[in-house]
Amino acid sequence: MEFPSKFTHKKMVGIIPLDGFKNDWRLPYSPYFAPIAEGLTLIDNAVLQCAFAGCRQIFILCNEKDVKLLRHNLGEWVEDPNWWWKKTVDHQAAYRVQIPIYYIRMSEKDKRQRGSAAWGIISTAMTANRMAGFASKWTAPAKFFVTFPWTATPFWDIGKHRATSVARKKVFYSHEGRSAWEGEYLPFTFDQDDLRKIKKNFRKKNTLTYRMVADYEPGSNSWFERLPKEEQRSGRFFTVQQLVEPINKNKLFEIELNKYYNVFTWENYKMAVADYSFKRPKSRYLKAGQESRILQRIGVNESE
């Protein structure tokens, strides 16, 4: 289904890729479950960044083995902070908005052939489009907000710029002159036109097992040759910096962040924890204790 380039709505969907990274901290659990503050993990902080930025839905690309733990810790929705303290209504609780969280995975074929975080972002955006397409192509996201568990930025700082990130067509976040275009794990947004561009760029640069060396000849194998093993399936090593190359950075609105740590490495993670700038919100935006945050299934009674 071909999705429109322009929408009358401003629906923004959050994308958090957890799969496709090669950092191994030698922990008994995945690195994004590491705490950055008391009661706040790296993935919690990323989900809150999406919520504070103004996302209507959040898609988390993860390993299948981690889904159960993620659903246990996060549930299937997070509160929209913008509606939590609405003062224009008499009963605040009745008008609160829940942002659904969807857990998806890369197919085994994708993991073998192009299993990078960059392709994970593309496939997650396509999944969001497919889900919207079941209703109508006009319900597809107008733009996508990408953040990472390695983006150690206080979610409050993202929330300060919510009006800008929602109203502007596209934005990107920077710190000290660096952004995703310089290889940092900083948030950025892209629209449907950009999605088509980055897909085309990925497929153009991604190598397969063989390459063509001459014109196609039926019944002959002289027109292709096998690539060296280290050059095969280059999409597996595609970086986020390569992903955003087709997007013209100068056409995006820049938002400067005061604080940011790239916690992809253990050394930077220790620096972020030692900063004491990260705190779990007192308001119950996230799942707390034994609270059940399971979305009601359509056509299914709660007792079933």
Tell me what each language-model feature is.
Residues 2-14, 36-40, 67-102:
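Short acidic, glycine/proline-enriched helix-loop-strand junctions
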Residues 27, 69-73, 156-159:
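A short acidic (Asp/Glu
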Residues 1-11, 90, 133, 142-143, ...:
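N-terminal donor/sugar-recognition subdomains of glycan-related enzymes
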Residues 1-34, 40, 45, 51-58, ...:
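N-terminal nucleotide-binding beta1-loop-alpha1 segment
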Residues 80, 87-204, 298:
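Conserved beta-loop-beta/alpha segment of the NTase-like Rossmann-fold superfamily
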Residues 136-138, 153-165, 177-303:
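Catalytic-core segments of class I nucleotidyltransferases/pyrophosphorylases
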Residues 17-19, 63, 149:
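Cofactor-binding loop segments of dinucleotide-utilizing enzymes, especially the Rossmann-like FAD-
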Residues 57-63, 173-174:
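Short internal beta-strands
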